[in-house]
Design a protein with these regions (language model features):
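Conserved donor-nucleotide/metal-binding helix-loop-beta segment in metal-dependent transferases, i.e.
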Residues: 25-56
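Active-site-proximal specificity loops/subdomain of glycosyltransferases
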Residues: 1-15, 24
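Small-molecule pocket liners
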Residues: 15, 41, 58-61
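Active-site acidic catalytic loop and adjacent metal/ATP-binding pocket
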Residues: 21
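Extracellular/periplasmic catalytic domains that process cell-envelope and extracellular macromolecules
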Residues: 9-11, 37, 53-55, 135-136
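Catalytic core and acceptor-binding pocket of nucleotide-sugar-dependent glycosyltransferases
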Residues: 50-51, 60-148
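Conserved glycosyltransferase catalytic-site signature
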Residues: 1-5, 30, 87-89
């Protein structure tokens, strides 16, 4: 699973954005990424749901060239396991301490840094969809309870 993070260290990559394949891009995310690209910050973190409580989610971050030139070495030195949540541990232990002062965080639940555009109903960045393009109803209910 960690191979998908390796382009962050490649010389020919100016910007790398990591997303999960079961999520859909939306305008809220577009506006957030646009704001980050216009900033002087090397790393971007988004958290847009009450369950997005980790420092960095494996499918909701981006980095600019030169921010993590040793990403491959960091991955190789991390004791990898092929289990759910291992990427959260990797980002918490190996990445976040290195980028926490060089990142733009869009997160309305934990850090108070709002997204540049308003929420569209119950849509959120990182929203999961299945093979039938159906979202997870439990995720929507949790979000509804938190935003009123």
């Amino acid at each position: 699973m960690f191979w998908r993070f390796e382009p962050a260290a490649e010389d020919n990559v100016d910007v790398m954005i990591s997303r999960d394949t079961d999520s859909r891009l939306n305008m809220r995310e577009y506006e957030a990424v646009k704001a980050w690209l216009a900033s002087d910050k090397g790393f971007h973190i988004m958290r847009d749901h009450p369950w997005h409580k980790y420092h960095v989610l494996g499918g909701m971050w981006g980095t600019k060239k030169g921010t993590l030139p040793d990403m491959k070495e960091l991955i190789n030195s991390f004791a990898q396991q092929d289990a759910y949540g291992t990427d959260y541990q990797f980002f918490t232990e190996s990445i976040f301490p290195r980028i926490e002062h060089d990142c733009l965080i869009h997160d309305e639940f934990f850090t108070g840094n709002p997204f540049p555009s308003p929420r569209d109903g119950l849509k959120f960045v990182g929203q999961v969809f299945d093979e039938n393009d159906e979202t997870v109803l439990e995720h929507l209910e949790v979000l509804r309870k938190h935003i009123g």
